[in-house]
């Protein structure tokens, strides 16, 4: 299909593609083996997966041949949230499954990892070599005294050594955690000091945007401020000698050692991820070996349709959950592409160049990058051979309708566009990619299997074709087993279960359409509420950023002391643009035409740039707090922001408005 009307899909998978999809084969098998519906397609399978939750996850475990070294007593020991218990009695190991392809003689010498840096030189690592290095490093970790439950940390870019260190940690039953090297020392310590690591893997620096960035001073500070460290492992990415008192990476990974996989309980911690921490100390989110194993097999094997013939590239850093998700591509036997570099160096086409050169079949990126490519007027389908790219997936923020159209027109008409949405909290997706369903402009294809995703009003009534709170009414295996340093579970409970007892509220505004798709409107904790009507900030961003003069925008809704409501729109202009009366009028008219008069801001204010979290998300709630008069130190955690100086603009604006 080459065009889309309001009621017609932008893309429709053909019969052959539907038949060949893993989710179709799974449904046919589960119909025979477990009584799943044979007819009705994905919608029927999804309904069964939430109505028969235990049976569905048992089927997933069998379909993907999960190796339980001791059998489970039941699938769900307790389904109450929070606190659901999965597969009690079972023991297993995540890393054993991630390296299983190396056991196949026909595949052992094929690439497991394909590493690319800004020189665009490719460095493959075979399955056999990956398994050997993981085995060697796991043995060295044990020799250092690392035991199950000990935390192992990485201050590393997206390089093969990060994957090897993570898998070796998982192999011994340790708990992995990582930060990207563009994080400053305070940001890293806000995270690592909470979990008290015993080993730290570091680089001497990294390359980004054509420049070398030395990190030896930061590493020295981390060593001083992390008293629980027993060992620091030096990876000489910039070629420096190992500092005194550190261990050399090469020495720890040189042996030819068969990996020994510690068999741990299903709910044994695998890793700790972190929230952005914009308004306080980041939440340290603990997810389990078994929960991540099953959830990622489901997501990557069924929803993303990945298998041994695929190459999986997602632009990410080790400080974002998408890195963990990317590495789990190994579970499906897929070759995982690691790109370490700037998304826009030497030009905005950099990611498309990597996709071409590595033969990526699934390429994932941010919605912001897609829109930047559109604004730069590049033509990936014309300028690069993207014939192997079957799917482009986006996350980080909702992909605007113009982003769907641009990918369709400028990459390929027969392109599966998968806008997905989930969260660090589950290291997965609530809604998104389904290879057997059509793609509608501006919509996520469907809720994911095993996920009873609903849109609720404040009273807990499900809504269709109306904006409501994103809730999940059943447990997922990858939901946090706990937060670190939250002994009574109160912080965990208050994060997700305070509004609807026993039901996960994620904090997004969504619409579930009458044809089963999902629309994301933005965060509900930063929602706009004008004249009693709730509006999503993402809708306004999508409308205003169509204008070529607008690089990025930020909208805030502020309840005034006198009972009024002030809704300013802050705009970062493209080079050469001027915010004059004509542009202000064009901005307001664009919003009025695409949304409604109610969405039109009270003021349009130019700013030097838009502040973001360290993982690239717009900061809305702290800006709102600043505009309400909060002190900067109380409104935001300084270590969580990409450019703290930008926030002074909003603090000064608040002071002027109060004067």
What are these regions (language model features)?
Residues 109-111, 234, 245-274, 281, ...:
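Conserved pre-ATP/AMP-binding loop-to-beta segment of ANL
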Residues 167, 171-250, 358-359, 366-367:
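Structural core segment of the AMP-binding/adenylate-forming
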Residues 302, 390-517, 524-527, 540:
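Conserved AMP-binding/adenylate-forming
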